[in-house]
Structure formats: C-alpha cells, structure tokens
Design a protein with these regions (language model features):
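A structural signal for short secondary-structure junctions
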Residues: 263, 286-288
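Short, basic/aromatic-enriched C-terminal tail that caps enzymatic domains
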Residues: 279-281, 290-312
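N-terminal amphipathic/basic-hydrophobic helices that include classical n-h-c signal peptides
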Residues: 1-25
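Nucleotidyltransferase catalytic core that binds NTPs
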Residues: 21, 27-265, 273-277, 300, ...
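N-terminal hydrophobic alpha-helix used for membrane targeting or insertion
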Residues: 2-6, 53, 294
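Conserved active-site loop/cleft motifs that coordinate metal ions or position small ligands
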Residues: 268-272, 292-295
C-alpha cells in the first residue's frame, strides 16, 4: 500500500513531448478522445443506448503494428472500440525505464485513427491514482515466477490498473497480446476471479521478418543488438520442435538455455510451462500443450518472447 500511496503524488507526463502537466491534457487530436472517467463513460453510454457492443484495447502507447492488430481484432468482435494510452508507474520497479519509456500520443492517435479506433482514452496519473488512493490487487497463480522473479511488483501493478481500466470502460471484450503471455493469463485470472463480466481475447504476436516480436522497447536496441535479437524466437521454435520430436522437457530446455546464454548478454529464464496455467511440468516427455517462455538481455534492453509447444 505504501508503494501505491506514493503513486498518488505523481504528476503525469504529457505523452507528446515529456513535459509535465496537471489535470486534463490540452492536446489537439483528430480522433475522439477522453481524459476523464466521466467523459469516457458519457461516450460509451451513448453507444450502449444505440445497442452497440464495446471492445477495449489497453496500451502504454508507443504503438506499433502489434497494437494495431489488437485494435483490428477488437473491431472484428465489437461495434465500437476504445483504446487507452497510459504509462502505468505501478508496474515499473525502481531503476526501470518509467521516465524513459517512449511517449508519442499525437503519433499514436494518428495510428489509431487510421486503424478506425472509435475513441482513445488518455487518463492521467491523477485520474488513475488520485490523492488518497489506497488499494492494490495482489495476484498469485499464473503471476508467480517467470516475470515476477525479476519484477516482483509487476503483476500487482498490472492487475490493479487493468481492473480500474476495465471498470472504467466496462467493455464486452478486451484484447491482449500473446506476446506478453504470462500477463494474458494473469488478466484472464483477474477477470474470472473478480467476475468482471468481460471476455478476454488473445491476439497473436506480430513479428519482424526475422521473428523478433514487435515491442515498444525494441527502439532501445542498437544496430548490432537488433541483428542478434531475432535469435530468441528461433531458439524457442527449435525447442518446440525438439519437444514435438520426443526430446524430454529437461533436454529441450537445457539446449534452449545454452543457446540463449551463447547468443545474448544475459538470461533471466527459459521455461517450459503448462499452456493453460503456467504450472511447472514434469521433466520427462511433454504430455500436454505447453508454452515456452524466455527473457533475455541485450545490453540494457530486456526481451521476452514465447511460443506454443505440443506433445509428440
């Protein structure tokens, strides 16, 4: 609670150029937008009055084709789509890249306009964590291990802000990318446990030609590191093929770990987990659908990726 309470004193950053502001951002955008809960709900209430369904795509901005694919998936499911842009301080640990995280609301809004998004929601930290805010959501289950080892506050911060956003928007469908697979399962658990009444839909990972998963943080990669980054997906696919070919989980995982250690500057984890729950699996041959997950480092940039694996 001390951590969340401290967030209430933060002044939000102007996503356009990093200047600070207090209150509603004064930004000239072409796309319909809302910066307060009341303005957001007024627009959605008018849609509901016309019998329209609502889809939601939460983002932290710095949008790329992966985000826009999620918007398209939401549009295929619903009559109207809301996308939010909010860089959530509660999911950044001390020393992480909160202040450096790219903010480009004007460019992002242009992309959302082209994707035919119907409304962009731009809450400030004063809206999301007002003075006196004293609530946080503590996640277990699929939130344990993996990303939580390196970022112990991450999923509590994600769960809290996503619960708020889902309550503010109250969509029929919310779309999250498989690129952040553990986060996807955490949010499904959150929606199920709290009876939030929203269908959580998964969007497939969008990749560069060499297999690198699109990520806003790819912008941090220098030219040499960018050349190396595509290895991660290749290593995971080789691991999946080895499992399908009858190698044990222990053998396939160890080979993938060695390949990551040879190809990257650091390795946080390489794991083979149950696809539905992220529970650990026996180290013999794969007997159930699994997910291969890895986190590695190139210089100061941390990359995560995952892929599906099936029994032989």
């Amino acid at each position: 609670l001390d951590r969340v309470g401290a967030l209430a004193s933060l002044i939000a950053y102007d996503y356009a150029d990093g200047r600070q502001f207090s209150g509603t951002p004064m930004i000239n955008l072409q796309i319909p937008h809302a910066a307060t809960v009341s303005a957001l709900r007024a627009r959605i209430r008018s849609w509901r009055g016309d019998g329209l369904s609502v889809g939601f795509v939460p983002t932290m901005g710095a949008l790329h084709q992966g985000h826009l694919a999620l918007v398209q998936l939401a549009k295929a499911q619903c009559d109207r789509v809301v996308a939010s842009i909010y860089v959530n301080p509660a999911q950044f640990a001390p020393g992480e890249d909160f202040e450096a995280y790219p903010r480009s609301v004007i460019e992002d809004s242009q992309k959302l306009t082209e994707a035919k998004c119907d409304l962009v929601y731009l809450p400030t930290t004063e809206v999301m964590y007002p003075e006196g805010f004293a609530t946080t959501i503590s996640m277990t289950g699929p939130a344990l291990g993996l990303e939580s080892e390196a970022r112990p506050h991450f999923f509590n911060g994600v769960a809290t802000v996503v619960a708020k956003l889902l309550n503010q928007v109250r969509p029929d469908v919310a779309v999250f990318g498989e690129k952040d697979y553990q986060q996807l399962l955490v949010i499904r658990q959150l929606a199920r446990d709290l009876d939030l009444g929203v269908d959580i839909i998964a969007g497939e990972t969008v990749r560069e030609n060499d297999g690198l998963a699109l990520s806003s943080r790819n912008a941090y990669l220098g030219a040499e590191d960018r050349q190396r980054a595509g290895q991660l997906n290749q290593i995971l696919k080789q691991c999946a093929a080895a499992l399908a070919g009858g190698q044990t989980i222990a053998q396939a995982r160890q080979a993938a770990l060695k390949a990551c250690q040879a190809g990257f500057d650091g390795v946080d984890y390489v794991e083979v987990r149950c696809a539905d729950s992220l529970a650990q699996l026996p180290e013999g041959q794969l007997a159930v659908p699994a997910r291969l997950l890895a986190a590695v480092r190139l210089g100061t940039t941390r990359l995560i990726d995952n892929c599906a694996a099936s029994p032989s």
